[in-house]
């Protein structure tokens, strides 16, 4: 599974700032878009980085180690306040594009729908307050219950519209959380 296109929402007055900000970041194979929205939506998502370049990219940042995943990451905020992660997984082939995208809601119900697209739970659990990871190591939809704190800030997760197109079989589409999220696989 790979993220081909992701469309998120942001306040209209920040769209130009976001375009300028992400124009300077290599988003690899993923097309990242922002559309105007009411309110102040925010998301958690992560970009892949090559393992060999991680220390260079993370210079001056607080680094978090994930030994169970053989991964390292650092975090920052973009102009809209999104919690953005840069993560490197040792041994991951072709580490480009988006690595993670957080979806907030009923984790068990979302997982049941995502299984129709061939995505499997590869880590985590559906226990109350816990995260579930669908997809594969390095290319993951993170299912989070509402109000669970995102790393590293602890900021409570919120539900905001997401449209995502994933590559790889089987082809199909699902809508989650009453149509708030639309996930297409082609």
What are these regions (language model features)?
Residues 4-12, 36-59, 72-77, 97-106, ...:
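Vicinal oxygen chelate
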Residues 1-33, 69-71, 106-140, 146-147:
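Core segments of cupin and vicinal oxygen chelate
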Residues 59-116:
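Surface-exposed beta-loop interaction hotspot
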Residues 19-26, 50-58, 87-90:
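Short, intrinsically disordered, charge-balanced linker/junction segments flanking boundaries
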Residues 120-124, 128-186:
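Charged, low-complexity intrinsically disordered regulatory/assembly segments
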């Amino acid at each position: 599974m790979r993220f081909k296109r992701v469309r998120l929402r942001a306040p209209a007055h920040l769209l130009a700032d976001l375009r300028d900000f992400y124009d300077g970041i290599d988003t690899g194979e993923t097309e990242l878009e922002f559309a105007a929205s009411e309110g102040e939506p925010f998301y958690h998502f992560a970009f892949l980085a090559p393992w060999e370049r991680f220390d260079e990219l993370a210079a001056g940042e607080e680094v978090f180690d994930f030994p169970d995943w053989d991964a390292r990451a650092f975090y920052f905020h973009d102009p809209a306040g999104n919690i953005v992660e840069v993560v490197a997984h040792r041994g991951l082939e072709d580490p480009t594009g988006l690595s993670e995208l957080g979806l907030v809601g009923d984790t068990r119900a979302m997982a049941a729908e995502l299984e129709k697209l061939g995505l499997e739970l590869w880590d985590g659990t559906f226990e109350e307050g816990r995260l579930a990871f669908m997809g594969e190591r390095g290319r993951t939809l993170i299912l989070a219950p509402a109000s669970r704190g995102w790393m590293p800030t602890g900021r409570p997760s919120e539900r905001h519209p997401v449209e995502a197109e994933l590559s790889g079989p089987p082809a199909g589409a699902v809508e989650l959380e009453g149509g708030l999220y639309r996930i297409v696989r082609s």
